[in-house]
Every structure is written in C-alpha cells, then in structure tokens.
C-alpha cells in the first residue's frame, strides 16, 4: 500500500501479485508460511511459480507439447489430453525400497513434483527450476541450554503470531498424536 499498490479485495492471495510486481523473484525471500502458486507475467510472457520452504503445499507439473501442465494433485494432469499415461518404474522402485520418494519424480513418467524451496519460470516452452531457499544450521555452542530454550520459545510464539494473520478464520486441531 505504501508503494502505491491498490488492492481490489481482502484476499491474502492478492498480496502475491503485488509482491511479484514490486520485487519479482526476490519476493520469495519475503514470504513466510505455506504456499504453492503460479503467476502469469504478461509483460515477459513468462509463467513464474514457487513452492513453500518445507513443501507443505503440493505442486505437480509436466511439460507436454510445449506447454506446462500443473496442479496441486496429479490426477488433474492425468486427465489432460496432452499427457500420455505411463508408469515410472524408477520412482516405483525407490518407493517400494524406501517407503518414501526423495526424488522429484512421481509414479507417472514425466510428472514431477516441484521440490520444497524451489521456484520456476516457464518461457516459450523452456522450463527453468532453481532452489531459492536452503536451511542453514549454525550451531552456537557458546549458548546455554536455557538460552536455547528461550530462543525456541520466542521463535515459536513469533511463528504462531504471524500465522494467525489470515483472510479466513484460523484454528488449530490437536489430536494428541506425536505431531500435535
């Protein structure tokens, strides 16, 4: 708003468009939270998209007949007439061996997941993917256990405060499982 952007509604999604207009790809360094999005840049005739740091929101894609087909679920790509369904034996073998796929490949040949912390541009049939975020682990061994506990507490409170900001109601479900 301070930089002259006019918002048409109260959706937090509109912030992405204005952030892209203002900062371009560097907008990703200013985002916090879970997201997967695509923006069409009509001036550059380029599709730009990204996935959140931890990959909470899914994003799948393929390139067929010079077009990028994408979605939050693989089934939407499978239904597209330009995609020819074929099993990916490499991904299947990895999954059956490790019970998890660490690769960007899926069970379907040519369909990939955009990895966490990655963004892409698609211009004139050419897909370019790059990593925009990587975790850093700088252990400060001079701190005491109590200092670490206080720092974690501060970070958790800060994170919860930031995630309460939304254009829809926010809630929390605690199931008593290990991830709650």
Model-derived regions, located:
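Cysteine-centered catalytic environments shared across enzyme families
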Residues: 1-180
């Amino acid at each position: 708003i301070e930089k002259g952007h006019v918002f048409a509604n109260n959706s937090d999604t509109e912030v992405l468009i204005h952030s892209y207009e203002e900062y371009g790809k560097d907008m990703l360094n200013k985002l916090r939270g879970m997201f997967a999005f695509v923006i069409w840049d009509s001036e550059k005739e380029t599709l730009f998209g990204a996935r959140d740091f931890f990959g909470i929101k899914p994003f799948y894609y393929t390139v067929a007949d010079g077009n990028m087909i994408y979605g939050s679920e693989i089934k939407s790509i499978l239904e597209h007439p330009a995609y020819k369904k074929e099993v990916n034996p490499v991904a299947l073998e990895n999954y059956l061996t490790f019970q998890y796929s660490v690769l960007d490949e899926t069970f379907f040949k040519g369909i990939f997941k955009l990895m966490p912390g990655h963004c892409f541009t698609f211009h004139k049939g050419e897909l370019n993917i790059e990593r925009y975020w990587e975790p850093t682990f700088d252990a400060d061994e001079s701190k005491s256990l109590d200092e670490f506990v206080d720092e974690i507490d501060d970070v958790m409170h800060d994170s919860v405060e930031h995630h309460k900001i939304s254009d829809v109601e926010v809630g929390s479900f605690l199931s008593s499982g290990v991830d709650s």
